[in-house]
Amino acid sequence: MSENNKAILEAANAAIAQGNYEGFLSFCTDDTEWTFVGDRTLKGKAAVRQWMATEYVEPPLNIVANLIAEGDFVTALGDFTIKDEDGKAAYYSYCDIWRFRGDKMVELRAFVIPAEVKAETSNAA
């Protein structure tokens, strides 16, 4: 079951990367609950859909460093970049803990912190 849950999360993330937010939501239960620790809780697909519409002006760039699965849980560690309406990028590091019910994502506890991007150095004179 754990490997199957990892594959489901990877497929859901691929939908997000393509801007297919409804495709992503098809992997969630109707009563899905997302808790952004220290920020807010979204209850149900409609709330998540509305949040995505405002937060994902364009698909985020998500770099998953690790996926760890055990039982009904998959933990994802990584970094992502989102752009606002003006095209300004914001960078974050995260730890998402997903709980599955059957083959659907039912609960998310997300720990998200702003990250600084190190300036690239150049040898150009």
Regions found by a protein language model. Give the residues of each.
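A beta-strand edge to alpha-helix "cap/lid" segment located at domain peripheries
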Residues: 1-14, 35, 39-42, 47-125
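Short, well-ordered alpha-helical segments enriched in acidic and aromatic residues
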Residues: 18-35
